[in-house]
A protein has these predicted regions:
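Membrane-embedded alpha-helical bundles of multi-pass transporters/translocases
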Residues: 1-436
Length: 436
């Protein structure tokens, strides 16, 4: 642990130093549209990039600490860690932005603060285990070398999502000014349920699946995956419906202050709705991929991720092109929609692979589950739409009114969903038993 921590920190420190110095060059590669049009966003983004570059080292060390904790079955802290980024960004947007000369730079400082908070959160748990690293250089250490060889396939597979995001950003820089920001705000709101549920589920089931595979217990391996998928459906489908319907009120409540105008809310709403459609698929990928990793199969998820990446790139061009031809005011939403479609392709291919290898077989009751979830979501969605159809009143309301009404609306929606779901036959106690 000491050698891995020290080597990782040293390598990242060098990369970060280069990144801070060469920020304009990096930005010209990943946001060429701003450079070609000589937009003012270029210099601003270069400055924000310099602020956020240290986050790479902070989150990498946080991930290493989280891996240590997961190994010793300490899941709570790593599962809660991603939430801090969303909380920090929201706090920076609401509290810090109004005190800065350029309000949007508050988000960059929010990212940096989140990195520090995420890393600090791991420390008490590591100390309690007696595993607080004492960084040491160990490039030639056998353990470091072994980890480097094992992590390359997983690292490549994980980077596919980032490549998709970069490709989206490149295209967005050629669209109307504000497209990158609208996608970013939408993505941040999508990352909240992904961080809370997706990463938490993946974190919990991976060691569980690994144990089942080591014991050659195929039935329990399949049952664990089935439980995780059912839980994902029960939570993510209503979350997707709620996020899409409440996109406007959520964006207004969190961001519609000062420079963030009603037009920004409308444009961000388009992309948030498109992202929301893919939420169940994004979570499903995080649940299904551990089914391969637990069996030491890191190659198949990488191949599938590459296929999804290529499809995402092609769909980006297709969807954005179609929206531009139709004269739609928010062609950037095509980028979000392409990401959602690619996520479904990823999830379907992962699912088919597990079925083909006969390591996963759905348990009875899926039809009843889908019927119950569909009825509950339809009822909840209709009521939420009725309660929030007047967006204009939200725009004119005070911050306190917005927060109060949004909170009450969400609570009401959750209650309606649970009630209708239980009436329709949703058995949540079966899911709780499946977690054991």
């Amino acid at each position: 642990i000491d050698h891995v921590t020290g080597t990782l920190a040293a390598v990242l420190l060098v990369l970060i130093s280069i990144g801070i110095f060469a920020a304009p060059l990096v930005l010209s590669i990943f946001a060429p549209g701003w450079l070609v049009d000589d937009r003012p966003e270029f210099d601003l983004s270069a400055g924000m990039l310099r602020i956020t570059f240290p986050y790479i080292m902070l989150i990498s060390l946080t991930a290493l600490a989280g891996g240590i904790l997961n190994t010793f079955e300490r899941f709570l802290v790593p599962a809660l860690t991603p939430v801090l980024l969303n909380v920090s960004l929201i706090a920076a947007a609401l509290l810090l932005s109004q005190h800065l000369e350029v309000p949007v730079t508050a988000l960059a400082w929010g990212v940096l603060a989140a990195g520090l908070a995420q890393l600090i959160l791991q420390v008490p748990a590591l100390i309690r285990l007696g595993l607080m690293p004492r960084p040491r250089w160990g490039w030639k250490h056998s353990g470091v070398r072994r980890i480097m060889k094992q992590m390359i396939p997983t690292l490549f597979g994980s980077s596919v999502a980032q490549v998709n995001l970069l490709f989206d950003s490149i295209i967005a820089t050629f669209l109307v000014t504000g497209s990158v920001s609208w996608l970013y705000y939408s993505d941040r709101l999508l990352e909240f349920p992904l961080g809370v549920l997706g990463i938490a589920l993946a974190t919990v089931i991976l060691p569980n699946l690994s144990q089942k595979h080591a014991k050659a217990n195929t039935h329990e391996f399949s049952a664990t995956l089935d439980w995780a998928l059912r839980l994902a459906v029960i939570i993510t489908v209503p979350a997707a419906v709620g996020l899409a319907i409440l996109a406007g009120p959520i964006l207004i409540t969190l961001f519609q202050y000062d420079a963030f105008q009603p037009d920004d809310v409308r444009m961000s709403t388009y992309s948030l709705i498109a992202y929301s459609a893919g939420l169940p698929a994004f979570i499903a990928v995080k649940v299904l991929a551990p089914g391969y990793y637990a069996r030491q199969d890191t190659t198949t998820p990488v191949k599938i991720a590459i296929a999804a990446m290529v499809s995402n790139m092609l769909l980006n061009i297709l969807f954005v092109g179609l929206l531009l031809i139709q004269g739609f005011e928010g062609p950037h939403a095509g980028l979000a929609l392409a990401s959602s479609a690619a996520a479904y392709l990823n999830a379907i291919l992962l699912y088919r692979g597990l079925r083909k290898r006969q390591v996963y077989s759905p348990e009875p009751g899926w039809t009843r589950l889908w019927v119950a979830v569909s009825l509950a979501c339809t009822t909840m969605g209709a009521l939420l739409l009725f309660m929030t159809h007047d967006t204009e009143s939200w725009l004119q309301a005070s911050a306190i009114f917005r927060i109060r009404n949004l909170s009450l609306t969400i609570v009401f929606g959750v209650i309606v969903y649970i009630f209708i779901g239980m009436v329709a036959g949703l058995k949540t106690h079966h899911l709780l038993r499946g977690a054991k």
